[in-house]
Amino acid sequence: MRGRRAPRPGSTEVPAAARDADTLRARAASPVRGAQLAEDVGTPTGGGEERRGHQLPTAAPRLRESKPQGGSEDRGTADRDLQRGCQSRSPRTAPPVPGMGDRGAQHERAALQSPGAPEGAAAAVNGLLHNGFHPSAASSRDPPAPRFQLPSELQPQPLFAQHDSPAKKCRLRRRMDSGRKNRPPFPWFGMDIGGTLVKLVYFEPKDITAEEEQEEVENLKSIRKYLTSNTAYGKTGIRDVHLELKNLTMCGRKGNLHFIRFPTCAMHLFIQMGSEKNFSSLHTTLCATGGGAFKFEEDFRMIADLQLHKLDELDCLIQGLLYVDSVGFNGKPECYYFENPTNPELCQKKPYCLDNPYPMLLVNMGSGVSILAVYSKDNYKRVTGTSLGGGTFLGLCCLLTGCETFEEALDMAAKGDSTNVDKLVKDIYGGDYERFGLQGSAVASSFGNMMSKEKRESISKEDLARATLVTITNNIGSIARMCALNENIDRVVFVGNFLRINMVSMKLLAYAMDFWSKGQLKALFLEHEGYFGAVGALLELFKMTDTQ
């Protein structure tokens, strides 16, 4: 719009705004002039084209400069009336103004209050009526059309953008609903990306209402069906069905908690699957712990458009362990120990109540080993650790036996005899070393017999796998026992995926703790060995929602 020229000093020239207001009031005096006025401001009358040079953006400032002339008690400016028209969801109807074509105004209001009429247009016309304008008389044969259309920037905006897809609108509704109830939108995941294995927990809601199921977007249904209807994913992904926690209540929803694992070397396939299933349309952030949360952060962002909320793995380990133990294992205790571990014939698994767990020595046996002294839920310290862990066992077995998987290595170890590989106390002393209480069957030197060519030629791959397993397990047990004595803690809890389907190591650890402490130390184990970090990450997802 071209700027108005300011009046010269001393001039009697009437300001343009005043002339415009006088002209508009004069034209409003008759119904016929009202129609001409509508044409002047560039509004179609009965479907005619707008006149060039009188477009809406030019006329709107005039309307805002005019003073209210209607009979309403509200003396607000046209700006305020326009704002009401834009913002109010239930615009009030202006009362008829005497001498301003009430009949025409009734037609106008009737049209705008009819079903399907835009609310913003009705409010805008009401604003005009309040400021001394009336529309032209409408023909009774033709349906009346709105006389004034707001600029796009003043139009009332719908709750969701008009161009959004139904799936996106549904996702936004789910997020708003979740926000009101202080819980995150589905799906609910927690990840622990370790050096050897990725552990994933997924909460499957079982209390979905008919309305939720109807509004559920297709890719969310696809993810749930894919994860819960399969027990294997590709060549290496496994869902541990026997560990599933059923009828669990988490964050106010009832459902089942699933436990899934796959090798870390297959992480790129998982990220690609997340991209193909458009996971970022459901979530923008995943809660993840473990070293891989840092290593793969950029890949998640670039390939799957996902952000990783990185969490401390030891914090998640403790929080997840305490939570799973508190809910139990489908009506059974999560924790157990081995009774009579020094007697193979009488040794058997027994449940253990861990209601009062503090203090405890927590030995996390993954690719490597970390040992924590835990004094309360939020008070713990890392005492020590060792690089000789589950990764060492599998790596050496692959070198020595040619096996390729953890399961294959354990299967071979179960069939082997480590005494053919290790040098024992009796091989040196001819029997027990009684002065220090060393039995002749105790290992004096791991792999000590492999110095002999004859021994090397007589052993089997299974013997090598068993000796490797015994070596790693004895080393961990020895360090754990010393830490327990130094910290004056009599309960040692062993967790981690090194113990998965590894009954040989568990019984060896139970035997070592009991024998070398003369029954003072008890080795404890948990059913969900290596998944506690992932559970802790899932719990953090709920905490994030509470904080927000």
From Swiss-Prot:
Disruption phenotype: Pank1 single knockout mice exhibit reduced hepatic CoA levels, a reduced rate of CoA-dependent fatty acid oxidation in the fasting state, impaired gluconeogenesis, and mild hypoglycemia in the fasting state. Show a reduction in pantothenate kinase (PANK) activity of about 50% and 40% in the liver and brain respectively. Pank1 and Pank2 double knockout mice develop progressively severe hypoglycemia and hyperketonemia by postnatal day 10 leading to their death by day 17. A reduction in PANK activity of about 90-95% seen in the liver and brain and hepatocytes show reduced levels of NADH.
Domain of life: Eukaryota
Single GO MF descriptor: ATP binding
Any Gene Ontology biological process: coenzyme A biosynthetic process
Binding site for acetyl-CoA: 367, 370, 382
Locus of motif Nucleolar localization signal: 1-8, 168-185
Keyword tags: ATP-binding, Coenzyme A biosynthesis, Cytoplasm, Cytoplasmic vesicle, Endosome, Kinase, Nucleotide-binding, Nucleus, Phosphoprotein, Transferase
EC number: 2.7.1.33
Reaction equation(s) it catalyzes: (R)-pantothenate + ATP = (R)-4'-phosphopantothenate + ADP + H(+)
NCBIfam families: panK_eukar (TIGR00555)
Biological role: Catalyzes the phosphorylation of pantothenate to generate 4'-phosphopantothenate in the first and rate-determining step of coenzyme A (CoA) synthesis. Required for the hepatic CoA increase during the switch from glucose to fatty acid oxidation that occurs in the fasting state.
Name of the featured protein: Pantothenate kinase 1
Species for this entry: Mus musculus
